[in-house]
Structure formats: structure tokens, C-alpha cells
Amino acid sequence: MKFIDEARIEVIAGQGGSGSASMRREKFIEFGGPDGGDGGKGGSVWATADRNINTLIDYRYAKTHTAKNGEPGRGADCYGRAGDDIELRMPVGTIISDYETGEPIADLTTHGERLCLAQGGVGGWGNIHFKSSTNRAPRQKTNGKEGERRKLKLELKVLADVGLLGMPNAGKSTLITAVSNARPKIADYPFTTLHPNLGVVRVGNERSFVIADIPGLIEGAAEGAGLGHRFLRHLQRTGVLLHLVDIAPFDENIDPVADAVAIVNELRKYDEALVEKPRWLVLNKVDMIPEEDRKKVVADFIKRFKWKGPVFEISALTGLGCDKLCYALQDYLDSVRRDRDDAEERAADPRYQDQAADKSPD
């Protein structure tokens, strides 16, 4: 399925039905009085997060979504039927904002999360509401209100635990194929990956994480060069970034250190928070370096790159070092989840709140 991560739509809620100005007409009842019912409420437009959907492609082609109008009221005190709501199912991770003002409206981060995008108009009043001691046969009624109408921008940020970044042909697609169930296109030319790929990595019966591969970055990506700039947003929600570097390029004129520095610079230009995110260095294609020279080449790279974080040496093609990398990632993600759960438990437990209050200065 083609991956679409951005769309623009218009949502139109239904108009409320008009009230009825009807009089009761019945044999042997001379002054029946008013019996006009109210109009029905217009249908609303709702958005629902669905984990079974992973693209916004449906909204690229169906751009206008209109709910039903409410039916008008009728005589005999009959109220009009309310218009049916419509439900727009969107991928988890969709950000909804106002297209004209840019104001954020919602961030659908949980499966089943539901939000009203456009409220249906209220129905008009029938003439039974205008009866009084001085007006026994009112002819007044009100029309239904217009439903809300909005132009919206939908933007999808994939929810993954691990994000891959690197230059084109660094081996990202090969790695995600080797360690997960994803099957992206792999070829020996730049920008083989044209859209993000998600894969599930399983390191045990009940232990797994989601990994995302985005198109390769090049220098100037933050300003729009290449393809990767369109997908950098997907890295903002990952728990850890794997910076993949081709340590043994075929072209001798390519400097792996310069490529690695360029990637970091592009992250900084796009979003400073991406640079601060936990990032691991993964040196790929180490099998292309003679074993007796491997240690020296890796040490020289780390020294020139001035890297002080975790380092993994792998070959995505042969699988060398991939298991070690996956288990380390799973252990790290598990520890982060435990810390987060403990923090949430403490925040919800009144005993910890009382302790914090006791320690606070008077």
C-alpha cells in the first residue's frame, strides 16, 4: 500500500432541521392550539484513532466529508430525526490542525481515541414553544442552525520505538529486513526507500519493539533537499535513534565521518530536540574491512567523530552483530518503560504526594 503521511480535508457538519408551525386539527376540538415539533439536530463529524490503519491515503482522494442534515419537525408534536454522524478513521499518530490558521486541534496517540471535528447544528424550535397566555395560536418557528465547517490538515507521525537515520545506501533497509518482518525495496542506488517502513522486531515470545526506516538524508535535507526532510517528523516520536553509518564505502572519495557529521547537522537544523534524543551509533558493513584492520578503522572513526555514546559494529547483510544490537535495544526500551510506569504510579499515589508536600519548604 502506498504510504501517505499528509492530507488536507474539509469537514462539514449537518444543518439542524427547521421547526414546524403546525396547528392541531381534530374533529370536535375547536381550538387545538399549536403542535409543531422541533427540527432534528444535524449530524457531526468525528475522528477516531485506529491502529489497524497506517496511512492517510484515503483522505488524499476523498477530501470533503459531509454529515447528514437534521429533518424538519412536523405536526402532532413530532420532532425531526437527527442527522447521522460520520466517523473518520485515522492512523494512530495523526496530528489534526486548522488548515487556515495552523492552530493544532488534536493529536491522536491512543487507539480508540475519539474527537469531534465539526459539531452539527441544533434543530429549530416548533411553534409549541411560543404558546403563551396572550398568544394561544402562535405562528412563529425558528430555522435550524448551520453545522460547523472546517478545513483541516492531517499529518501523520509514525509511532515507533526505534528510528533509523543515515545517508542513502547506508544499509537501513537491509538492517530492517534482517531484524524484523518488514520487506522494503532494496537496491544499489540512492533513495531506494521512498516512504517510511515499519517493522516489528521480536527478541522473545513476549518481547518486541517497533522500528522505523525513513528515506536517507543528505546535506541540506532540513531545507528540503532530497527526500528525507519530508519524513524527519517521524523520528520525533521514537524512543531511541540508530545512526547508521557505512564504515566501508565503495567510493574512496566518500568520508564516513563527514557523512555522519552532516546527518547530525541536519537533525540540529530541523529540530534541536532530535539531537538531544538518545542516539546510538551503528557502524554497518564492518565485514568489508579486513579483520586485522577493523579495530583500528573503528577506533579512528570514533575519535574523528568525537563520539561518546553506545557503539555497535554490524553487518546488516550477513547478520553479524544484529542480535546483540536488538537485545540491547530491547533491554534499554524495557528499562525506559519501567521508569515511566514507576513515575506514573508515583504521580497517581497520594502517599507520594503527601511526602512531597511534607518536604516542600514552608
From Swiss-Prot:
It comes from the Bacteria. Its main location: cytoplasm. GO terms for molecular function: GTP binding; GTPase activity; magnesium ion binding. It comes from Polynucleobacter asymbioticus (strain DSM 18221 / CIP 109841 / QLW-P1DMWA-1) (Polynucleobacter necessarius subsp. asymbioticus). Residues 129-148, 340-362 are annotated as: Disordered. NCBIfam families: Obg_CgtA, PRK12296.1, PRK12297.1, PRK12299.1. Its cofactor is Mg(2+). Its EC number is 3.6.5.-. Residues 160-334 form the OBG-type G domain. This is GTPase Obg. One of its GO terms (biological process) is ribosome biogenesis. Residues 130-141 have a biased composition (Polar residues). GTP binds at residues 166-173, 191-195, 213-216, 284-287, 315-317. Keywords: Cytoplasm, GTP-binding, Hydrolase, Magnesium, Metal-binding, Nucleotide-binding. An essential GTPase which binds GTP, GDP and possibly (p)ppGpp with moderate affinity, with high nucleotide exchange rates and a fairly low GTP hydrolysis rate. Plays a role in control of the cell cycle, stress response, ribosome biogenesis and in those bacteria that undergo differentiation, in morphogenesis control. It is an enzyme of class 3 (hydrolase). GO terms for cellular component: cytoplasm. The keyword Metal-binding applies. It is found in: Cytoplasm. Monomer. Belongs to the TRAFAC class OBG-HflX-like GTPase superfamily. OBG GTPase family. Residues 1-159 form the Obg domain. Mg(2+) binds at residues 173, 193.
